[in-house]
Amino acid sequence: MKTLQRVVAACLAVVAVGCGTESSEPEVPSLRSQVAELVSPNGRNLNGRNLNGRNLNNSELGSMLVSVDYADARSASGKVLNGVRLEGSAFVGFDGATRVTGTAFTGARFTGRLGDGSPLPLRVDSVAQGTGVDSDLWSYRVSYQGSDGSWRAVCQDANGADTSAIAVAGRWDYRQGVPGEGGDKIEDASAFTFACEGAAIAKCMHFGYKPWATGADGQSLAGHHQACTRMVRADFCGDGESHTTDGQWVNLYDAAGVQGDTESWSLEGEWNEDGARCFTSETRAHTAVSCPGFTAIPDCGDTTHFQSGTRLISETPYGVTGL
């Protein structure tokens, strides 16, 4: 049996976009990165409330960047790039008959979509490939064009400093308090997301839950990634609403060979793509959480539930001293 690696999850919400333009082929991920082994160090980290961070949170636009179109992508020189898609988090496309990828997307232009569906010009300012087990995580600095024609960073960290993003296929429903829809991952083949560093979507990829990768059992980690975005935000009800505050400690583990449990903390709950399958009274909410119509599975925390739909189990130090 392969030894599991444990991490305690953290998410401070921020969003980023990016894509670049030099000429560099993405490295083929090693088997080690493909099965997402040992991707995160052991340690206690912090959670956060936002799914994709401070995305265009300004008075000029008054809306959020919810997705980015693959169609009509253009190179830095303005030429249309055809067949643009993501291989992992690296862009691939064609400039005529020439295949372009990796840093060749520096300066590329994309069309983003705001919450009301209106378009927003985006520009990839820089592209950088990750290293080691994260060599398949490409980082992008992305700007949007304001009404005055100037370019501003799409993503900012908690201190307001510009930050980068990871590109990931599909889009999310950012609404909160919407049963059955809020917080959902939408597998839209025409769109992708620029996931800002520090927010749940990007954070969960750094934990090893890369949607394009597979676990030690050979199964896709896409479901684990989505479950992680729910868990990090304490979206117990699966309606997109967070039941925590930034800076709460949380530990998570799985049976996929990505994160293992070494903490002796209190059980919080079990998670799948739709939210919590069950949870205890000792949660990061520090108050009672009620989900209308929710029926918890029995024997919460039983690790045999990993065989019947549970993706992750979370623990909190609620009531534990010495932290």
Regions found by a protein language model. Give the residues of each.
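Bacterial N-terminal signal peptides that target proteins for export
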Residues: M1-V8
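Structured alpha-helical
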Residues: L12
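C-terminal motif of bacterial Sec signal peptides marking the signal peptidase cleavage site
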Residues: V15-G18
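Repetitive, compositionally biased segments used for assembly/scaffolding
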Residues: S23-L323
